[in-house]
Regions:
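N-terminal membrane-targeting hydrophobic helices
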Residues: 1-221, 225-238
Length: 238
């Protein structure tokens, strides 16, 4: 699956799990979790893509540690990570027992394929609905300092896409519009990147505005210093 689907399904599974355990995972972490297994691309050729970071032997213990250490937030984040393996096993295969075995397991519906396109574009639609109902869409439409952290999944999605294309000698612009299915997925990526970019802009604007306010540590002192607040809105706390 492409990063559009991975980030969106991660958001969906993380938010659903977080609601069940009464922990609200920030939007940027919910989007990032499902992208993490593809971080092996950053470490090529030291680590071959689609090996260790796509193995249950590696990820299940990692997620267990996260859940034990961070409780509800760890469970929600882990749900996003594991959604990556579920998605890849639907449209392709994964090596669940690597490095003990090279066995590949999956339904392998195809990539790209109508099924994959429906899963990826559909996931983006579900994310927009959840963001609207949970009011997280305000990270994009209003100034909130937390929104600046959306830069993390934004940069990850863009750089991983470029690196993967470069490593595999894929002419990205030509490939993106070579088939109708890919065109829809490309437009979905563009929409997601645009939304995240707008959120980062709103976050940066909020940070700059806060720093200019009297009483902020970076502003000239005016009377008694005021304690600075948390950079995260209270509604994102567990």
């Amino acid at each position: 699956m492409f990063l559009l689907g991975h980030s969106c399904w991660s958001y969906i599974f993380s938010k659903i799990t977080g609601r069940q355990v009464k922990s609200s995972l920030p939007a940027y972490m919910a989007l990032l979790a499902g992208v993490l297994p593809d971080f092996d691309i950053y470490f090529k050729p030291l680590i071959q893509h689609h090996t260790y970071t796509h193995s249950l032997i590696v990820l299940v213990p990692t997620c267990a540690v996260l859940a034990l250490r961070f409780r509800g937030l760890g469970l929600a984040f882990s749900a996003g990570i594991l959604s990556h393996l579920v998605a890849d096993s639907i449209v392709g295969t994964i090596p669940p027992l690597y490095p003990l075995s090279d066995l590949q397991v999956g339904i392998s519906l195809g990539l790209p394929s109508p099924a994959d396109t429906a899963l990826e574009v559909g996931a983006l639609g579900i994310v927009l609905v959840i963001a609207y109902l949970s009011r997280e869409y305000k990270l994009v439409t209003e100034s909130h300092k937390e929104a600046v952290y959306l830069a993390i999944p934004l940069v990850s999605i863009v750089t991983l896409t470029l690196l993967f294309a470069g490593d595999n000698n894929v002419p990205l612009a030509e490939f993106a519009f070579s088939r109708k299915a890919l065109t829809l997925i490309t437009l979905g990526h563009a929409a997601l990147i645009g939304i995240l970019g707008l959120g980062v802009f709103q976050g940066a604007r909020a940070v700059i505005t806060t720093r200019k306010q009297p009483g902020h540590p970076s502003s000239p002192p005016s009377g008694e210093a005021q304690p600075s607040g948390s950079p995260l809105p209270s509604n994102t706390s567990p």
